[in-house]
C-alpha cells in the first residue's frame, strides 16, 4: 500500500481511458510511473478526479461532479504503465447515507482516507460562483458573476463501512454485518457542526460566505489520525499561509 500511495502521489494521470475509447486518443508520450485508470461508460466517476484512497488491491475514486464513489480493482498492466486499475463498481452516496442535499446533487468530494474499516470522505463545504460564458453578453455575464450558490451535499463529512463482498472484494455498505453503520456529521443542506464551529473562528469565519474559487472556505484533503481528523484547506490562504483544521 505504501508503494501504491507514493506512486499515486507522484501523479498519476497521463490519461483517463474508458474501454470504449480507441487507442489513438491516448497521448503519444507516456510519463514514467504512469498509472492507467479504466472506467466504464456507466461509471459515476470518469473525470475530474478529486480524491483517492486504497483498500488492499482496490482503489477508491471520487470526482468533483459526482455524488458517488467508484471502486477500481488492480489489474495486470496492459502496456508500459507501472500500475493499472479497472473493472470498476459504482457506489451512489444516496444508497449509503441520508444526504444533506438531493440524491443527484454533486457532493464535490475532495478528501478520502481509509481508517479502521471505514472510508472517510469530505466535501469541499464551499460556496460556488457562476462563471462567465463566451456566448453571453456583458450584462448577462455580470449577473452570472453576482450569483453565489451552495450545493448541500458539499457540506458532507462521513464515514462509510467497508465490508468484503461475496466475491472477496471490498464494498461500501450502509450497515456492516458486525454492526458498523455509515454516519455523517450532523447538519443539513445549509450548514453542519463543522461550518457552525468555523463560523465563529477569527481566522476563517469571515471567509465562510465567500466562494471557494475566490479564496473562501474550501476543504481539499482529509487524514484520520487516531481520534483526530486533520482537514486540509485550499482556502482561505492568509498572507500566504495555508492551514489544517484539527478535529
Where are these regions (language model features)?
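Sequence/structural signature of beta-propeller domains
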Residues: 26-247
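Intrinsically disordered, low-complexity segments enriched in small polar residues
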Residues: 2-5, 20
Amino acid at each position: 500500500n505504501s508503494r501504491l500511495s507514493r506512486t499515486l502521489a507522484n501523479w498519476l494521470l497521463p490519461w483517463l481511458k474508458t474501454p470504449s475509447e480507441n487507442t489513438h486518443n491516448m497521448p503519444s508520450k507516456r510519463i514514467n510511473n504512469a498509472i492507467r485508470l479504466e472506467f466504464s461508460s456507466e461509471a459515476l466517476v470518469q473525470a475530474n478526479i478529486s480524491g483517492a484512497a486504497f483498500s488492499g488491491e482496490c482503489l477508491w475514486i471520487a470526482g468533483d461532479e459526482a455524488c458517488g464513489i467508484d471502486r477500481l480493482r488492480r489489474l495486470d498492466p496492459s502496456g508500459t504503465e507501472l500500475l493499472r486499475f479497472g473493472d470498476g463498481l459504482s457506489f451512489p452516496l444516496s444508497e449509503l447515507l441520508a444526504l444533506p442535499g438531493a440524491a443527484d446533487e454533486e457532493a464535490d468530494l475532495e478528501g478520502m482516507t481509509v481508517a479502521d474499516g471505514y472510508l472517510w470522505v469530505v466535501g469541499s463545504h464551499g460556496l460556488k460562483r457562476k462563471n462567465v460564458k463566451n456566448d453571453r453578453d456583458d450584462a448577462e455575464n455580470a449577473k452570472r458573476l453576482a450569483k453565489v450558490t451552495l450545493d448541500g451535499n458539499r457540506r458532507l463529512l462521513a464515514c462509510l463501512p467497508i465490508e468484503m463482498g461475496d466475491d472477496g472484494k471490498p464494498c461500501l455498505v450502509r450497515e456492516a454485518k458486525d454492526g458498523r453503520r455509515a454516519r455523517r456529521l450532523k447538519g443539513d443542506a445549509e450548514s453542519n457542526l463543522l461550518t457552525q464551529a468555523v463560523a465563529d473562528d477569527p481566522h476563517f469565519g469571515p471567509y465562510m460566505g465567500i466562494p471557494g474559487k475566490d479564496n473562501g472556505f474550501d476543504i481539499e484533503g482529509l487524514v484520520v489520525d487516531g481520534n483526530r481528523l486533520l482537514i486540509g484547506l485550499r482556502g482561505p490562504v492568509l498572507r500566504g499561509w495555508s492551514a489544517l483544521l484539527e478535529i
